[in-house]
Amino acid sequence: MKSFKETIINACLMGFFSFFSLSSVIFVKNITNNQIKNIKEKQKNTLIQQVIPRVMYHSFEKKYFLIKDKLLGDQKKHNLWLLFKNKQAKVAVVESIAPDGYSGSISILVAAYLNGKIIGVRVLSHKETPGIGDKIEISISNWITKFQDMNVIDLKDKKFLLKKYGGKIEQFTGATITPQSVSNAVKRTVVFIKKIPLIFSL
């Protein structure tokens, strides 16, 4: 039979190893969380640099928000970056959704001045048909760059219709739903961007 002293020693050892194991788990978890946070931060910065000039990226102060608005295509929270120059908000970069693509939702990133002038647009993800609807990708065609320097007036702005419907947006051979869906999403997103001074009381 173990002595009382041995029992106490074993209990202390078990307690020590339990504490050590728990501390190790917490330590590793904290390191992992910090690594994940850093990776996400790098991903966000990479996204922004896809749609704004390098000079603007490095010279403007950036503030990050999560925002929800039906103009962004759904009821989920979306990434928003506001860029400031001399403490004045000048540019917004927003992730949004075109919910009505031919093969499902299309995720896009839009950068625009708060007055509604578009700086850049990129498609982040989609499920469109290869060789047809996937021309929305910058790696496949320059179609998405055509939005640069366009101005959005309001949701009724007819410039953002396809040319076959009287607008200025090029369609794809054999595909009209996809480009119109993206164009509509770009327009809605910029209308949201124009609302930002009211939303944030800038």
UniProtKB/Swiss-Prot annotation:
It is an enzyme of class 7 (translocase). SMART domains: FMN_bind. One of its GO terms (biological process) is electron transport chain. The chain crosses the membrane at residues 11-31. NCBIfam families: PRK01908.1 (NF002519), rnfG (TIGR01947). Belongs to the RnfG family. Part of a membrane-bound complex that couples electron transfer with translocation of ions across the membrane. This is Ion-translocating oxidoreductase complex subunit G. It comes from Buchnera aphidicola subsp. Schizaphis graminum (strain Sg).
